[in-house]
Design a protein with these regions (language model features):
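Gram-negative bacterial Sec-dependent N-terminal signal peptides
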Residues: 1-22
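Copper-binding active sites and cupredoxin-like electron-transfer domains
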Residues: 20-347
Length: 347
């Protein structure tokens, strides 16, 4: 009886979509693009490095708003609205005290008007009204980065939730005057939701559902733009004992994230993305609301695959999981898997 219970439990664990073979960094479940279909996934490593220590400067940041048909899942496409053709939009890095010039160009082929509202801005609409651009137009404004932190930006053209759900969000980091402590690896991860008329898992080109958007019932949850985007070739990679920093944000537009890395504990959490308050320490899971962000740091002492999830775990089966693959020597003093004595007894 005991053996049967153990066997049943083992089978159930293996069946979990974010376990066993699904944890491999070489997993091919990441959406594969076809001819005429864009790869909208923003690599978690696609972010500029730390700024050199310097005084305030004038910094120009340009955005192109592009509407593209992209791969949402294998055999499934969706019409995305994007900043620079990827989801999330580009990671912007400036310094406290910088004067930042934002220039937004709406692509000639766009159907919709677009703009940008940056939560780092002190001024009306976060720049949204100043950058409202019809297809083919360019708009710009400047602002002074007054307060350090990690901030969400997004399109704020009505219907705002629709523009965000279709992929128009990103992060801007305002480094404090002295910069941030040096780390070995930095990653850029954002969570979002996609609302389609068709049920999750449907093949072909899907259409957005305003009804489901208003009811807050997404068919897909995504990291960096697509279902299971941060797996396979897009898995995050690190070495044992490296200090890892993740800049994490939630575009939403509606759902709060309980961000967690299975098998790890966050050594530091810059809660609510405040870079001036003392960080929390030894945290298992963080709560990040739509339009919010956080910065987490940790070391992976033991090699292997670590799974990025929202701990509302049903969402993993709708596309919300990623892999951090850590390479290095085994650490049996920290983590040791006992031999399968049951299997040995039957041989």
């Amino acid at each position: 009886m005991k053996t049967a219970i153990i066997a049943a439990a083992a089978a159930a664990v293996t069946a979990l979509s974010f376990s066993a073979a699904a944890l491999s960094a070489t997993d091919t479940s990441v959406p594969q693009t076809e001819a005429g279909v864009a790869n909208v996934i923003r690599s978690a490593t696609d972010l500029p490095g730390p700024l050199a220590k310097r005084g305030p400067e004038h910094v120009k940041v340009s955005f192109d708003t592009v509407e593209v048909t992209g791969a949402l899942a294998d055999g499934t496409t969706y019409r995305y609205w994007t900043f620079d053709g990827k989801v999330p939009g580009p990671f912007v890095r400036v310094r406290e005290g910088d004067t930042v010039e934002i220039e937004l160009t709406n692509d000639d082929d766009s159907v919709m008007a677009h703009n940008i509202d940056l939560h780092a801005v002190t001024g009306p609409h976060g720049g949204g009204s100043a950058t409202m651009a019809l297809p083919g137009e360019t708009r710009s404004f400047t602002f002074k980065a007054l307060q350090p932190g990690l901030y969400v930006y997004h399109c704020a053209t009505p219907m705002v939730a629709q523009h965000i759900a279709n992929g128009m969000y990103g992060l801007i980091l305002v480094e404090p005057e002295g910069g941030l402590p040096a780390v070995d690896r930095e990653f850029y991860v954002m969570q979002g939701e996609i609302y389609t008329e068709e049920a999750h898992g449907t093949k072909g080109e899907l259409t957005e559902s305003i009804e489901k958007l208003l009811d807050e019932q997404p068919e897909y949850y995504v990291f960096n733009g697509a279902a299971d985007a941060l797996m396979g070739d897009n898995a995050l990679k690190a070495k044992t004992d490296e200090t890892i920093r993740v800049y994490f944000g939630v575009g939403g537009p509606n759902k709060t994230s309980s961000f967690h890395v299975i098998g790890e504990i966050f050594d530091k959490v810059y809660n609510l993305a405040s870079l001036t308050a003392a960080p929390l320490t030894d945290v298992q899971t963080i709560t990040v609301p739509p339009g919010g962000a956080a910065v987490v740091e940790f070391k992976a002492e033991v090699p292997g695959p670590y799974v990025l999830v929202d701990h509302a775990l049903s969402r993993a089966d709708r596309g919300l999981k990623g892999i951090l693959q850590v390479e290095g020597p085994d650490r049996p003093d920290l983590f040791h898997v006992a031999p399968d004595e049951t299997k040995a007894a039957h041989n």
